[in-house]
Amino acid sequence: MTDDIFLKFLEYIQPETDFDISKSPPKPDYSDDANWAALPAIDGQQFYVPDASFSVMKSDNPVDVFYIHPTGFYEKEWNSNMDKKRSAYERTEIVLANQISAFNNSCNIYAPEYRQATYYSFFDINKNGQQALDLAYTDIERAFDYFIENQNSNKPFIIAAHSQGALLAHRLINQRIDNSNLQKRFICAYVIGYMIPEKYYKEIFPNIK
């Protein structure tokens, strides 16, 4: 893709108004299974395997994985409304199959839907993009809190994420895991597709090794 074509693409998905929290989509209720992209008890693309030689263990694994999916929202609103009839949801299903399915024989998979920020947010030079990402983070934090309180049952857990999900995972680890009682159950973070500056290990999650 040439620079000109990419700039045209960004122009096409640029929201036409500033971010306004009062006009944001309703926040998801994570006690409702419909607001999860993946759960151990519900069949979905997270249980995809390449062929019949692979086995799947959907639940009763000794470890959980909390997965934050990448950006799949390329539209002119700042945040997705999580409508399962829109293309963003189809992209989420694709990444469940080609990313988090890697854990489907070893971990119980939990992946929240969230009001992800539009891809344009990463290129916005004003405060709108950051505000959209902040809104997305509030969903991830609430989903994680619900997961810990209602689904995890004190098991060890992994954080897995990609792209926008990885960026939000950095913040989640800082706000909810680093230097908390959860740290002793936290096995590792597999967060790819977004840079992790070396200074983060001292400033953002200093107690995570």
Outline where the language-model segments fall:
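Short alpha-helical segments and helix-capping/turn motifs at coil-helix boundaries
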Residues: 33-54, 92-98
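Extracytoplasmic/secreted cell-surface and envelope-processing proteins
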Residues: 76, 121, 168-169, 198-201
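Active-site catalytic motif of lipid deacylating hydrolases and related acyltransferases
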Residues: 4-30, 67-156
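Short His-Asn-centered micro-motif
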Residues: 68-69, 160-162, 189-194
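Proline/glycine-enriched tight loop/beta-turn segments at coil->beta junctions
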Residues: 57-63
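Gly/Ala-rich beta-loop-alpha elbow adjacent to hydrolase catalytic centers
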Residues: 161-165, 169
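Surface cap/lid and interfacial helix-loop subdomains adjacent to catalytic sites
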Residues: 141-151, 175-209
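Short, well-ordered amphipathic alpha-helices
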Residues: 96, 168-177
